[in-house]
């Protein structure tokens, strides 16, 4: 992990040191979309790097599925707490934009719970995606979720009144991305076109996406899903 953490990212990390944050991330359950994707793409014995693993929610459950999992998180408080609760898991303090692992060392990389969206400022996110591509084996997958800027869910007056938008210009919010300052966290909201283009520029290929099941119909859910799960693969011949 680099000695100097950018001030903006350091501010985000402070939000993950509180007792409230520990309580919030203490539910050890998989979401329906995670169950579906994990069943489709993961197999026992495969190696997986769980980035921004928090208190080890997905790390534990993937370990129980038979994967060889290593979890890293920038929050030392989270890792220490998780290590006391789950001493048999491989949990380490680590940054998603400077992963201390060899090239092509994991079959899969996972960033759950929109964890990539807290990489702030944006160059941290770009660096994180490049690092994910670097540590993936050829043919390996990166699965992550990102807040859906185009969701009608976020355009309700009740929801918008709780947000302080940090925009370079207003048009940007309606095109591809916008940073939001909410409950002390700088959070990136994105369009799916932006996510796919940015991740492919990091060296990965788009494979699939999964909407949050709000209604149960993909044609409708895409307009109301507050976040989207994405699947990317590392080319066999870069």
Language-model features, listed with the residues they occupy:
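A short SAM/SAH-binding and catalytic strip from SAM-dependent methyltransferases
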Residues: 108-123
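Class I SAM-dependent methyltransferase SAM/SAH-binding core
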Residues: 55-98
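Short alpha-helix
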Residues: 186-203
């Amino acid at each position: 992990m680099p000695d100097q953490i950018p001030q903006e990212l350091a501010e985000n990390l402070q939000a993950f040191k509180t007792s409230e944050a520990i309580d919030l991330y203490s539910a050890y359950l998989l979401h329906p979309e995670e169950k579906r994707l994990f069943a489709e793409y993961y197999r026992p014995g495969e190696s997986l790097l769980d980035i921004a693993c928090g208190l080890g929610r997905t790390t534990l459950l993937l370990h129980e599925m038979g994967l060889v999992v290593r979890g890293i998180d920038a929050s030392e408080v989270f890792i220490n707490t998780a290590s006391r609760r789950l001493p048999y898991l491989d949990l380490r303090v680590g940054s998603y934009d400077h992963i201390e692992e060899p090239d092509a060392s994991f079959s899969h990389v996972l960033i759950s719970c929109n964890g990539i969206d807290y990489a702030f400022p944006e160059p941290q996110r770009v660096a994180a995606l490049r690092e994910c591509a670097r540590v993936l084996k050829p043919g390996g997958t990166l699965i992550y979720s990102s807040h859906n800027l185009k969701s009608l869910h976020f355009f309700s007056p009740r929801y918008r009144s709780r947000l302080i938008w940090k925009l370079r210009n207003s048009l940007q919010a309606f095109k591809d991305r916008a940073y939001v300052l909410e409950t002390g966290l700088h959070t990136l909201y994105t369009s799916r076109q932006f996510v796919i283009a940015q991740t492919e520029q990091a060296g990965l290929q788009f494979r699939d996406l999964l909407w949050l099941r709000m209604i149960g119909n993909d044609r409708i859910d895409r307009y109301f899903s507050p976040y989207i799960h994405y699947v990317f693969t590392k080319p066999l011949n870069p």
